[in-house]
């Protein structure tokens, strides 16, 4: 009985940590340069699993095969999306991408490449900020919301990047 009383607090802590990491928040590591310069290779971010209301330009973690990739939501369900002359057009209107550096080049692209006029309900178009070095929706197609693990907008490590991701 004494043993149970001694170990019970530790078991409760372990269960709470497992529940929090499974359903609420968990750390995730950036692997590669596809989000550079916004995020660096090896950076550790906090993934909010509970937040399922995705907005344009949110940084999200996507399950792609057996890996997790960090990308930015560019297109929402119902959007017609294309890039022409390094400019993003959504539903025919030019949209600014303030998070991109002036040197970033985005090759021409049209969502019609996938034989769709607009992004279907429950799907999103994601891209890396480092457009010439990113495996994203231009290659893998639109991403179902069930494959988006959550939003990540807070950097934990390295410590010089600690804080809200812009």
Q: What are the roles of these predicted feature ranges?
A:
Residues 24-30:
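Sec-dependent signal peptide cleavage junction
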Residues 3-4, 11, 19, 23, ...:
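Soluble "head" domains of membrane/secretory-pathway proteins
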